[in-house]
Amino acid sequence: MSIFTFIKEASKNISQVGAVCSSSKFLAKKLTDPVDFSGKKVIVEFGAGNGSVTRMILKKMGPDSILYSFEINPVFMEKLKTINDPRLVLINDSVEDIMKYVKKHEVDYVISCLPLANFNRTFKESILSHVNTALKPGNLFIQFQYSLKDRKLLKHFFKKVNLKFTLLNVPPAFVYVCKDFTQHSH
């Protein structure tokens, strides 16, 4: 996908896309570095966009693992369909419907590229509640943002929130690595 197509889609609905450029390979690396890819894993990606993070996950994943990638933008979904990998399951649906596609506590990792800062608090809490249901206890929710706006919300939902940063993205980005849901999240 060309940069111009990405910008065109982003400008149509910036609150949905949340970015002006696709994620850099450096950001994709930061998002996937905390993941233990050994063995059979079930990984969920929220907001697959044009597939830059999707490709990095697939590159690192084992042959028996599966990646469920959610994307609601039809242009991005068409681009994602060009990725020919039997481990990839593309889902053109809201992330709130994750439980239609996975079993309770089946997911090893959730990697989110959703523009949380653009969503209202109720929707964010709904997303995190569904992540709590889908994620195996003790496993990771990894989210990137361009600001620290939702740090407090994530700390409310998770006992451990580690923050990483990369300048090598346009714009530079924060990566939250979250573990162990709190009692408040139930």
Predicted regions and their residues:
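Conserved SAM-binding strand-loop segment of SAM-dependent methyltransferases
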Residues: 86-95
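Conserved beta-strand signature within the Rossmann-like core of class I S-adenosyl-L-methionine
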Residues: 137-145
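Glycine-rich SAM-binding Motif I of class I
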Residues: 51-55
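Class I SAM-dependent methyltransferase Rossmann-like catalytic core
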Residues: 3-35
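Conserved SAM/SAH-binding beta-strand->alpha-helix loop
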Residues: 73-75
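A short acidic, Gly/Pro-enriched loop at the edge of an enzyme's catalytic core
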Residues: 100-110
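A short glycine-rich, Lys/Arg-flanked "PGG" loop and its adjoining helix->strand segment in the class I
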Residues: 125-137
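Conserved class I S-adenosyl-L-methionine
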Residues: 40-49
